[in-house]
Amino acid sequence: MEYTGRIIKGVGSFYTLLTDNGEFVCKARGRFRKEGITPVPGDYCRFETGDDGKGCITEILTRKNLLIRPAAANIDKLMIVLSSSLPRPDYCLADKLIMQCELSDITPVILLNKCDEMDRETYEAALAQYKDTGYDIIPVSARDGTGIDRLKAEIAGSTCCFAGQSAVGKSSLMNALAPGLELPVGQLSDKIDRGRHTTRHAQLWQVCGGCMLDTPGFSLLDMAEIDPAK
């Protein structure tokens, strides 16, 4: 049988697709690799299942957009999470993420997380960095609930991808938005004030009347794949 679904996660060579009939685990046809196409979370696909129940992705439908890193497709908003305390904000990384948004018709939203434990100097520096950009800047706290209702309103009716350094609190925010997720939460290294990875793969969740995508934290973003002419 043939179905249409949306990739909600990919682990190794296996992809989980969400359909009106539930979830299916599929592999992608070899021709995608030959054509240099990699299925990513957010992709809408056609796939077939055999009598054994195993699925195979046969077509990736036209993408509205594609993020390089985090790898995701058909995104409406990119929630760029910065910490108001530790780890210190990586503005270079945030600016590269914003550049991806501008080139891909994605709305960037700046989330200043951990505002309940903010370092005032760090918080005000982050505000100053982006206050004249015209982008929405939302102070939030997964711990005391600051900004969570506004964040839910941002997600409603949209597909939102959360991105940023490790330990800035992406998974904590998602747990606050949808407590039933119970995503693992990382800790900050006492020695180097950097986060440890807890999210191992990107996953799309249907919550708050929309979709949100949790992604692994990272600190490097190579822009070499973007056409310099753009």
Describe the predicted segments one by one:
Residues 15-19, 26, 47:
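SH3/SH3-like beta-barrel fold
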Residues 13, 30, 36-53, 61-78, ...:
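Helix-rich effector regions associated with P-loop NTPase G domains
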Residues 23-30, 56:
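A short macromolecule-binding patch
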Residues 1-11:
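Structural detector for short beta-strands of small beta-barrel domains
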Residues 93-96, 124-125:
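Charged helix-capping and loop-helix junction motifs
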Residues 170-186:
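A conserved segment at the C-terminal end of the G1
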